Amino acid sequence: MSSKAVAHPNIAVWIMALGIAFSMALVLTAVFNANPWEDHTYDLAPPIVAGMPAPHRDGREKMVCSSCHIVTPPAIGTGPGSGTLPIVQGTPAPHVDGREKMPCASCHTIVKKGSVAKGAKAAPLPAAVTPGMPLPEAVSVALAVAPAPAAVPLGNEAHERMVPFRYQGKVVSIAGAGARSVWGDIYIQINDGINPPIWIDLAPRWYLQAEGCVVRPGMFVKGTAFRDPTQAAAGLDYAMSVMANGEICALRDNHLNGLWANAGGMDAEER
């Protein structure tokens, strides 16, 4: 009887300690809910103009600027009125390459609705336009996206002629059969703001969904891929891995064999 009486308080203490530890874990998880594997603050870092010195002096100046910042091309001209179109006050920015986060007045003349900017030089009227005809104050131009290169059969010895490289950048466009069907391959066009945009063949859409690496336009992705040196950036590259949504997904092995071949896609429609 005495041994049982001594054991009960010890069990109660351990149960109470485990309950306190579990409660503290819940509180800390709710307070510090930042996932260290999530994508870094790529969308929060201010854009950097290509050719400008790095704004950091704590060691980050040795890193690639496009890892955290959107690199924009240098502006032509020295200020407002140097060939840029005016912007009507209150309208959304006409850019989608990172410049939409910059103050519009840095490059454009801000025009109030229904008025003409003071001191702005009137553009010459086209020959077919008569005086008195209202002219548009701002123009939104849609940028054309180059179509994705056609995929070619790789063969068993494709890895011997292709070279590996690292890629990173923002997803500009998505193409391939995976854009229409869960069973098709997904091609992404990425732009790092410095080099010409490239097309990369990732994997079937169901495999990306199963691995948690679904990509969308505007996302920052990076990884490793194989490229045919005879085609350079004009051809279709083949990804070995991709990091998206904070997840790192292996897509192909060193012989360019898709890892989804042994994964199976029986329940892909349910994911």
From Swiss-Prot:
A motif (MCR 2) lies at residues 87-110. The chain crosses the membrane at residues 11-31. Keywords: Biomineralization, Heme, Iron, Magnetosome, Membrane, Metal-binding, Transmembrane, Transmembrane helix. GO terms for molecular function: metal ion binding. Heme 2 binds at C104, C107, H108. It is a single-pass membrane protein. Heme 1 binds at C65, C68, H69. Its cofactor is heme. InterPro entries: MCR, Multihaem_cyt_sf. It is found in: Magnetosome membrane. Residues 32-271 are lumenal. Binds 2 heme groups per subunit via the 2 magnetochrome (MCR) motifs. Pfam families: MCR (PF18509). Residues 1-10 are cytoplasmic. GO terms for cellular component: magnetosome membrane. SUPFAM superfamilies: Multiheme cytochromes (SSF48695). Its main location: membrane. A motif (MCR (magnetochrome) 1) lies at residues 48-71. Belongs to the magnetosome MamX family. Required for correct biomineralization of the magnetosome, may be involved in redox control of biomineralization. May function with MamY, MamZ amd Mms6. This is Magnetosome protein MamX. It comes from Paramagnetospirillum magneticum (strain ATCC 700264 / AMB-1). The lineage of its organism: Bacteria, Pseudomonadati, Pseudomonadota, Alphaproteobacteria, Rhodospirillales.
